[in-house]
UniProtKB/Swiss-Prot annotation:
InterPro entries with a match to the protein in the record: Cyclotide, Cyclotide_bracelet_CS, Cyclotide_sf
Membership in a protein family: Belongs to the cyclotide family. Bracelet subfamily.
Protein name listed in UniProt: Cyclotide cter-Q
Naturally occurring in which organism (per UniProt): Clitoria ternatea
Gene Ontology BP, a term: defense response
PTM text: This is a cyclic peptide.
GO CC term, one of those recorded: extracellular region
PROSITE patterns: CYCLOTIDE, CYCLOTIDE_BRACELET
Keyword Disulfide bond among UniProt keywords: yes
Subcellular location: Secreted
Organism lineage: Eukaryota, Viridiplantae, Streptophyta, Embryophyta, Tracheophyta
Length: 30
């Protein structure tokens, strides 16, 4: 539930390496 400061509209989240995932076009962590 914490925003990772990254969007995933056109490209996937690079921050998946630190546990972030794409939700509603924004990358979140927990």
């Amino acid at each position: 539930g914490i925003p990772c400061g990254e969007s995933c509209v056109f490209i996937p989240c690079i921050s998946t390496v630190i546990g972030c995932s794409c939700k509603n076009k924004v990358c979140y962590r927990n």
